[in-house]
UniProtKB/Swiss-Prot annotation:
This is Large ribosomal subunit protein uL15. GO terms for molecular function: rRNA binding; structural constituent of ribosome. PANTHER family: 50S RIBOSOMAL PROTEIN L15 (PTHR12934), LARGE RIBOSOMAL SUBUNIT PROTEIN UL15M (PTHR12934:SF11). Belongs to the universal ribosomal protein uL15 family. The gene is rplO. It comes from Burkholderia mallei (strain ATCC 23344). The lineage of its organism: Bacteria, Pseudomonadati, Pseudomonadota, Betaproteobacteria, Burkholderiales. Keywords: Ribonucleoprotein, Ribosomal protein, RNA-binding, rRNA-binding. Binds to the 23S rRNA. Residues 21-31 have a biased composition (Gly residues).
């Protein structure tokens, strides 16, 4: 086998179907478009979702929910991540410096994932009920 002798396997390549090129091709006359109707005409198309004048599905269904504008500015921090921090007083600035939340975050909440075994003081951060219980059980406290 040499690079200049490589070729596709027998039957691997097929010629493209040429539509509208005579009755013998099997795709002559109407070229696979059928008879009459909008889709058989040149330039005949409709918008995505158009249902022939019937109210489209995306307009029949009610609007629901909304996009929160504050979502991207609120961060979540796990208890397990707080365990690894070298500081005992934890506030938003300490979380940003440790890289646990992004620079754009304006408020953060501690969630009860992982374990906390050391005493910490939390300042100006929210916490779930489970996280608050775990921090207080480890001897920690919340300073608002």
């Amino acid at each position: 086998m040499e690079l200049n002798n490589l070729k596709p396997a027998e039957g691997a390549k097929h010629a493209k179907r040429r539509v509208g090129r005579g009755i013998g091709s099997g795709l002559g006359k109407t070229a696979g478009r059928g008879h009459k109707g909008q889709k058989s005409r040149s330039g005949g198309f409709h918008k995505v979702g158009f249902e022939g004048g019937q109210m489209p599905l995306q307009r029949r269904l009610p609007k629901r929910g909304f996009t929160s504008l504050t979502k991207e500015f609120v961060g979540e921090v796990r208890l397990g991540d707080l365990e690894k921090l070298p500081v005992d007083e934890i506030d938003l600035l300490a979380l940003k410096q440790a890289g646990l939340v992004g620079e754009l975050i304006k408020s953060a909440k501690i969630i009860a994932t992982g374990e906390l075994k050391r005493k910490i003081v939390v300042k100006g951060l929210g916490a779930t009920k489970g996280a608050r219980a775990a921090i207080e059980a480890a001897g920690g406290s919340f300073a608002e």
